[in-house]
Swiss-Prot record:
This is Acyl carrier protein. InterPro entries: ACP, ACP-like_sf, PP-bd_ACP. It is found in: Cytoplasm. Belongs to the acyl carrier protein (ACP) family. Pathway: Lipid metabolism; fatty acid biosynthesis. Carrier of the growing fatty acid chain in fatty acid biosynthesis. Residues 3-81 form the Carrier domain. GO terms for biological process: lipid A biosynthetic process. SUPFAM superfamilies: ACP-like. Transmembrane segments: none annotated. 4'-phosphopantetheine is transferred from CoA to a specific serine of apo-ACP by AcpS. This modification is essential for activity because fatty acids are bound in thioester linkage to the sulfhydryl of the prosthetic group. Keywords: Cytoplasm, Fatty acid biosynthesis, Fatty acid metabolism, Lipid biosynthesis, Lipid metabolism, Phosphopantetheine, Phosphoprotein.
Length: 82
């Protein structure tokens, strides 16, 4: 099953909203988790765990630090599921 960027973005937006209350429409591919969405490290780890559970993948800690934008996370998930 191939995942579209739009579907993964939609699910990441829902996960971010559930954890932080940020409006799903604000969660866009070019938005940085910390700089644009003001997500702290604890919330980011919860978001990562929820994404791992949803997609059945593991995101190593060193990779989490590389996921600066929502688009980075979407692309990582798509690549991990390919």
């Amino acid at each position: 099953m191939s995942l579209s960027r739009e579907k993964v973005l939609e699910s990441i937006a829902q996960i971010v909203h559930d954890e932080t209350g940020i409006d799903k429409g604000s969660v866009q591919l070019d938005k940085a988790f910390v700089d644009d969405l003001d997500i702290d490290s604890i919330s980011m780890m919860t978001i990562v765990v929820n994404a791992e559970e949803k997609y059945g993948i593991e995101i190593p800690d060193d990779k989490v630090r590389e996921l600066r934008t929502v688009g980075d996370a979407v692309d990582f998930i798509i690549a991990a599921k390919a």
